[in-house]
């Protein structure tokens, strides 16, 4: 459908919504003078030239629409034309909210079913593999909404399916307004879920797979209570009053990608934020997730940034923090990967009078503006789903309402005000104003009225209005309120265009390092004060590795520091191996050793890395008596080796040349265990059991039992290594950016960390951005 022009309000009924700086049709009509009272022949002769021009115009319009409806090329569809219509007055629905009875479900087989967490999807084809994975998410009920194209025998165990016939029996008012062949029939599903106890609704797509199969891991599913995080959230700055919309993909590392619904005039704004502010969590009632693979992009991007047979596989930074939108700044919101809390359920309504690919985007902007009336906000989350690009035709024509109107809509919404005193009246007021302005038609005004009445009928309680912050003087943002975060600039290597000029060498190196170590877990034991260093270590190494697990002799829940004993550190590692079972390997390092990760790229991640080639780290000791420490440890090694299975025992004895008189000791400040040997490592830990075997003895024993030293990767053999002395003090002359690692290096404060980063910047210049 084409977007309708704004209808003129009746002279007897002035508009009830207040719109700033937007001309009305009454003002437009006053520009024209009254027609003269002429007889037809005189009028015809005086206006012959005008009639000819007008006739030509009519023929042109008819020809254009004929071509428009018979041509499927993107170039023609870029041009938009709105049909000229007679101005018609709109009537605002009058609803008696207190007279709407609550109507429980008495007809469906699920009349007595109640649950709080729902996943609502529209289905046109038989169940996809992605949809089957959604059904497996624990604690969430999948609700599949059919349309006229859905197979009659559609079925998926674990889901609830509502066919067209089943939908019709529910008796909702919105059914009179919904098309039969569109995904916007999801509105029926939202009402059904609310009627059956929904408190959270995940608006999903049947080709999207939730990453790790856990919505609670990615979204803030709980906003109140013991399970809620109640933490400050990074927020875009509101300091620039001229900025009304942002591209969230920049925040998550993809500055050359833009979401469907972003005004095309804003596509070129690719600079990251100078600074952010913070907002307290708990009112992010609409949570927009980012999708890896095929993110929500518009047809302009889809057609111009890829070849026909190339599938998109775009990745975003999973480590970027979630980010909130302040009042006055908007963001595109879709129906593919979005979590709605009950306070925003009214905002799930999908408009029916606009093109299908514009429906959820218009809903998102409409909903954001109304959310401000409740003191709520939208937050955007790091990758929560993976959508697969099936290389299907992407209909530009279905987005025509976006490219023509979305920029104007945002300006309109920021200027719009309402004087209504209840929230549902305010919702209806905005829908009326949007119909007046031609963003949708009177059909959606009536649909809004039906939707709001259905919400009450299924038991939904309308929220209470709060004062709008937009009309208050904005507080100045002080230096202490500024929060810095520099997004990664991930190169879009998948794109059909070259981006050589936009991605610096440093960024390219970072991507290369991240690609190499992105599935390696770094385990760090902190001997120093974690209160002063834990966050810094995560900042330094978290850019490179899959995750950074920090251990210390004392637990610190606030900093996510786990308790472990260094003497028996190997006994703690199996827990971490199990937690990150998909990791490619595990790199252990103590905080007195610096990793120059750029020099580890050549190492084989399928082999053991250790310091067996570093003479001061890996030594053989001959015990001198029965009671000294080395003798005790040697006896424990003999006891362990005697219980080893044949393959371990043979490896160990071959490596030590069956010499029972010496004990292999390794300082073990840094070592790497590949995934293929994780099971062997765990088996050896189990063999040690409760014995008091020190890690400097256990780790080399494990490695010699697991594989031949000839197979160890020699990458750490060239590290800078000096033994600590009682008067040890870090010296800048010790550090070398050309070595794979440096030991020792003392870090006990933020200032020590800054000094280290300044040294490491020789190998990784981007580190200077951290200080």
From Swiss-Prot:
Primary location recorded for the protein, binned into one broad class: Golgi
This enzyme's EC code(s): 2.4.-.-
Topology within the bilayer: Single-pass type II membrane protein
InterPro entries: STL-like
Lumenal side: 72-771
Keywords, ordered alphabetically: Glycoprotein, Glycosyltransferase, Golgi apparatus, Membrane, Signal-anchor, Transferase, Transmembrane, Transmembrane helix
Subcellular location: Golgi apparatus membrane
Stretches that traverse the bilayer: 51-71
A Pfam match: STELLO
Domain of life assignment: Eukaryota
Region described as Disordered: spans on this chain: 1-23
Knockout consequences: No visible phenotype, due to the redundancy with STL2. Stl1 and stl2 double mutants are impaired in cellulose production and exhibit a stunted growth.
Tissue and organ expression note: Expressed in cells that are expanding or producing secondary cell walls.
Family, per entry: Belongs to the STELLO family.
Protein name: Probable glycosyltransferase STELLO1
Originating species: Arabidopsis thaliana (Mouse-ear cress)
């Amino acid at each position: 459908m084409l977007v309708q022009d704004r209808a003129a309000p009746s002279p007897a009924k002035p508009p009830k919504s207040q719109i700033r700086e937007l001309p009305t049709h009454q003002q437009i009509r006053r520009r024209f003078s009254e027609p003269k009272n002429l007889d037809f022949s005189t009028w015809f002769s005086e206006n012959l030239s005008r009639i000819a021009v007008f006739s030509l115009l009519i023929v042109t319009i008819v020809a254009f629409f004929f071509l428009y409806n018979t041509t499927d090329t993107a170039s023609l569809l870029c041009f938009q034309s709105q049909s000229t219509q007679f101005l018609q007055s709109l009537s605002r629905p009058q609803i008696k909210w207190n007279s709407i009875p609550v109507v429980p479900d008495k007809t469906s087989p699920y009349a007595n079913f109640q649950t709080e967490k729902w996943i609502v999807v529209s289905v046109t084809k038989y169940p996809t593999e992605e949809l089957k994975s959604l059904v497996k998410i624990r604690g969430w009920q999948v609700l599949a909404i059919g349309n006229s194209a859905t197979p009659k025998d559609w079925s998926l165990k674990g889901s609830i399916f509502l066919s067209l016939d089943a939908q019709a029996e529910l008796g909702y008012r919105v059914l009179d307004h919904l098309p039969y062949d569109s995904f916007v029939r999801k509105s029926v599903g939202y009402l059904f879920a609310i009627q059956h106890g929904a408190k959270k609704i995940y608006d999903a797509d049947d080709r999207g797979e939730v990453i790790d199969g856990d919505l609670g891991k990615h979204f803030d599913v709980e906003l109140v209570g013991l399970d809620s995080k109640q933490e400050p959230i990074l927020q875009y700055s509101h300091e620039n009053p001229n900025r009304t919309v942002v591209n969230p993909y920049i925040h998550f590392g993809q500055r050359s990608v833009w979401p469907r619904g972003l005004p095309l005039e804003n596509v070129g704004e690719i600079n990251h934020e100078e600074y952010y502010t913070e907002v307290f969590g708990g009112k992010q009632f609409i949570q927009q997730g980012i999708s890896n693979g095929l993110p929500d992009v518009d047809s302009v991007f889809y057609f111009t940034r890829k070849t026909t047979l190339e599938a998109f596989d775009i990745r975003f930074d999973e480590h970027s923090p979630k980010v909130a939108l302040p009042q006055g700044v908007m963001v595109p919101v879709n129906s593919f990967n979005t979590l709605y809390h009950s306070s925003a359920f009214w905002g799930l309504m999908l408009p029916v009078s606009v093109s299908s690919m514009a429906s959820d985007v218009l809903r998102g902007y409409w909903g954001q503006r109304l959310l401000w009336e409740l003191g709520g906000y939208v937050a955007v989350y790091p990758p929560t789903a993976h959508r697969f690009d099936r290389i299907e035709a992407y209909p530009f024509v279905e987005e025509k309402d976006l490219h023509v109107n979305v920029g104007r809509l945002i300006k309109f919404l920021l200027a719009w005000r309402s004087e209504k005193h209840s929230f549902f009246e305010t919702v209806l007021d905005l829908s009326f104003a949007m119909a007046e302005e031609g963003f949708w038609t009177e059909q959606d005004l009536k649909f809004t009225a039906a939707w709001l009445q259905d919400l009450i009928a299924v038991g939904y309680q309308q929220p209470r209005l709060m004062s709008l912050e937009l009309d208050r003087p904005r507080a100045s943002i002080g230096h202490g309120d500024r929060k810095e975060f520099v997004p990664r600039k991930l190169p879009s290597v998948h794109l059909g265009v070259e981006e050589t000029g936009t991605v610096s060498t440093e960024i390219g190196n970072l991507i290369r390092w991240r690609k190499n170590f992105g599935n390696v877990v770094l385990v760090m034991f902190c001997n120093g004060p974690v209160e002063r260093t834990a966050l810094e270590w995560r900042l330094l190494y978290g850019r490179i590795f899959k995750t950074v697990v920090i251990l210390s002799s004392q637990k610190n829940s606030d900093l996510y520091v786990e308790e472990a004993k260094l003497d028996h550190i190997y006994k703690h590692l199996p827990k971490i191996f199990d937690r990150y079972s998909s990791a490619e390997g595990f790199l252990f390092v103590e905080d007195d050793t610096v990793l120059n990760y750029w020099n580890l790229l050549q190492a084989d991640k399928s082999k053991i890395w250790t310091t067996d080639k570093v003479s001061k780290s890996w030594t053989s000791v001959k015990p001198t008596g029965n009671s000294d420490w080395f003798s005790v440890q040697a006896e424990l090694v003999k006891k362990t080796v005697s219980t080893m299975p044949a393959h371990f025992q043979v490896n160990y004895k071959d490596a030590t040349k069956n010499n029972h008189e010496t004990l292999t000791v390794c300082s073990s400040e840094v070592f790497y265990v590949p995934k293929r040997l994780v099971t062997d490592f765990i088996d050896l830990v189990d063999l040690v059991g409760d014995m008091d075997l020190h890690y400097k003895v256990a780790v080399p024993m494990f490695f010699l039992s697991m594989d031949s030293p000839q197979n160890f990767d020699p990458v750490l053999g060239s590290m800078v290594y000096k033994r600590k002395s009682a008067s040890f003090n870090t010296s800048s002359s010790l550090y070398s950016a050309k070595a794979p690692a440096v030991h020792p290096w003392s870090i006990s404060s933020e200032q020590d960390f800054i000094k280290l980063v300044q040294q490491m910047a020789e190998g990784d210049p981007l580190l200077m951005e951290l200080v």
